[in-house]
């Protein structure tokens, strides 16, 4: 009996069982840069806000139908954001105007809609670059380059 236990205990480490991952990630990046993925409609009225939200819902429905379980939602593009911030302005892709309030929180909406579908939503942030000189100028006084000059270095 002792010999059997000894042999089994010596062989046990060499027996391997292929384990499945606890959670498989099937993710898609959803970009807002230049409206490549979303949004197509500018949020300038109650109707266009509803349309902008419907566009996102449609994308999420298609991702869910394709068996995706994670969305990497772009929340910061080039020095502007897709959520209310006291540091940086709203992205102009939302309303057509840099800093223009779209009338809702796009990130909170994306999270809520992902969760309704049993999907995870991860914030994807582009940290650098802030953009070319023309883009940075379009951000106005709320730009990080204006407010925090000591941390920004122009590319030459």
Which residues fall in each region the model found?
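Active-site-adjacent "subsite" loops/lids of carbohydrate-active enzymes
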Residues: 23, 31, 35-54, 112, ...
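Aromatic-lined carbohydrate-binding/catalytic grooves of carbohydrate-active enzymes
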Residues: 66-102
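Hydrophobic faces of well-ordered beta-strands that scaffold small-molecule active sites
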Residues: 26-30, 71-73, 121-123
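Aromatic- and glycine-enriched glycan-recognition loops and surfaces
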Residues: 45-66, 93-117
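N-terminal signal peptide c-region/cleavage motif recognized by signal peptidases
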Residues: 13-14, 22
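Extracellular/periplasmic catalytic domains that process cell-envelope and extracellular macromolecules
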Residues: 19-24, 64-65, 115-116, 144-145
């Amino acid at each position: 009996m002792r010999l059997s236990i000894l042999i089994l205990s010596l062989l046990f480490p060499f027996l391997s069982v292929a384990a499945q991952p606890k959670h498989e990630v099937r993710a898609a990046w959803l970009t807002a840069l230049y409206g490549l993925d979303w949004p197509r409609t500018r949020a300038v009225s109650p109707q266009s806000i509803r349309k902008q939200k419907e566009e996102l819902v449609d994308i999420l429905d298609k991702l869910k139908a394709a068996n995706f379980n994670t969305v990497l939602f772009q929340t910061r593009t080039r020095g502007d954001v897709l959520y209310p911030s006291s540091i940086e302005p709203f992205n102009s892709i939302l309303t057509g105007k840099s800093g223009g309030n779209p009338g809702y929180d796009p990130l909170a909406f994306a999270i809520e809609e992902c969760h309704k579908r049993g999907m995870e939503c991860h914030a994807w942030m582009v940290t650098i670059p802030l953009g070319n000189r023309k883009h940075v100028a379009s951000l106005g006084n709320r730009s990080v380059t204006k407010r925090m000059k000591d941390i920004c270095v122009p590319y030459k």
